[in-house]
Amino acid sequence: MAADITLLFKASVKTVKTRNKALGLMETTGREEPGAQKRPRPRQRDSFSCKAREVISNISKLKDFLLQHRKDYVNAGSVMSSEVSRMTDSERDQIDQDAQIFMRTCAEAISQLRSEMDKKQVSMQVKDHRAAVLDLIDSYLKGVCKLYSEQRAVRVKRVVDKKRLSRLEPEQINTEKRQSDGEENDKPVSDGNVDLWEENRVEDDLSPEEIQMFEQENQRLVGEMNSLLDEVRQIEGKVVEISRLQEIFSEKVLQQETEIDSIHQLVVGATENVKEGNEDIREAIKNNAGFRVWILFFLVMCSFSLLFLDWYDS
C-alpha cells in the first residue's frame, strides 16, 4: 500500500506560494471573492503576521506528516519486527527528498521575512516583536529538522543492522541442517534388535578429534558473532554521531543564511552611502567652480572700474 503524501504536497505548495509572495512575484488578480475585497487594508497592514502564520502552519503540517508515517518509515530493513511495512524504499527516498526541499524552502521563507522586516520603516517595538517571532519560528523549524534527522538515523541504523545480520543467515541454515541431521541420527529404532541399536549407537559416537573440531568451529562462530556485535555497536555509534553532526550542520547552514542576509543588507547600505558621497563630491566641485567664476568676474569688474576712474580723472 502506497503512503499518502498529499499533506506534504499541499504544505510544499503553500510554502512556495509564501516564498513567492515574499519575493513579490505574485500579484493580486481580479478573480478574488467579493468578501476578500472588503478588507484589503488589514491584509496589507498585517502581511507579516499572515506570512508568519502560513510558515508556521506549513512546518506543523510537515511535523504531523513525519509523525504520522514514522512507524512505516523507520521499519525499513527491520529484521526484528514481525510487522510488514507498507512503505517501499523508493517512497522513503521520496519522503527524504521532499522533506529536505520543504525544510529548505521554509528556511528561505524565514530569511525573506527577515529581509523584509529590515527594509520596512516601523517602530523599534514592532521590529523587536517581529524579530522574536522569527526566532521562535526558526527554533520550531530546527526542532522539526531534528525530528527528521532522528528518524532518518534510525532508518539507516536498521538498514545497516539488516545487512550485517543477513551475513549470518547461510551459517544459521547450515547449523540448523546439521542439528536436524544429528537429531535424525540420534533417534533410536523402536522395533529393531537391541544389539543392532547398541552397535549403531557406538558408531554414532563422536571421536575426540571430531569433538575438538566442533569445539573449534563453535569458538570460531562465537568469535565471529562477537566481532559482528562489536561492529554493529560501532556502526550504531557512528550513525548517532552522523545524526548529531547533521543537526549541527543544519543549524550552521541556517545561521550562515542569516549572516549572508545581514551582510547583503550591509553591502546594499554601503553602496547607497557611496552613491550619496559621490553626489556630494560632484555638488561640491560644481559649487567651487561657480565660486571661482564669481571671484574672477569681481576682479575683472574692479579692474575695469579702476581703468575708467583713471581715464575720467585724466
UniProtKB/Swiss-Prot annotation:
One cellular-component annotation, GO: endoplasmic reticulum
Biological-process GO terms, alphabetical: intracellular protein transport; retrograde vesicle-mediated transport, Golgi to endoplasmic reticulum
Compartment list: Endoplasmic reticulum membrane
GO terms assigned for molecular function: SNAP receptor activity
Biased composition (Basic and acidic residues): 170-189
Keywords assigned: Coiled coil, Endoplasmic reticulum, ER-Golgi transport, Membrane, Protein transport, Transmembrane, Transmembrane helix, Transport
Domain t-SNARE coiled-coil homology positions: 222-284
Sequence similarity: Belongs to the syntaxin family.
Name of the molecule in the record: Syntaxin-18
Organism: Danio rerio (Zebrafish)
